[in-house]
Amino acid sequence: MTTIRCVLFAVLLFAYCALLIKARSIDAEAEKTWQEEETKTVAEKSPLKKRGCSDAFPVVCRSPSVKAACYNPNHRSHAFITDVCKHTCHLC
């Protein structure tokens, strides 16, 4: 009886782990798909698209914290952010 319980427990544990791994991969795929769709949607609606900009970085450049760094030359990330935004045709 104990052996049957151990085998049953092992099978259930294996099945649980397999389902958990599958669920994580489905979540990762869904997240990736959502990010790709969001990037495409934002890029298509963006006025940057009209100027030939199709990179995903303009989404990042439009965030409030990045804009604050762009407008503040004393910010520690100002040079990096300005450089990245210029390469994507986005003017902070």
Swiss-Prot record:
Lineage, top ranks: Eukaryota, Metazoa, Cnidaria, Anthozoa, Hexacorallia
Alphabetically ordered keywords of this record: Cleavage on pair of basic residues, Disulfide bond, Neuropeptide, Signal
Top-level taxon of the source organism: Eukaryota
A single GO BP: neuropeptide signaling pathway
Propeptide residues per the UniProt entry: 24-51
Function: In vivo, this neuropeptide induces contraction paralysis followed by death (within 2 hours) on 4 zebrafish larvae on the 15 tested. Also induces body contraction in Nematostella 11-dpf polyps.
Name recorded for this polypeptide: Neuropeptide ShK-like2
Entry annotated with the keyword Metal-binding: no
Paired cysteines (S-S): 53-92, 61-85, 70-89
N-terminal signal peptide: 1-23
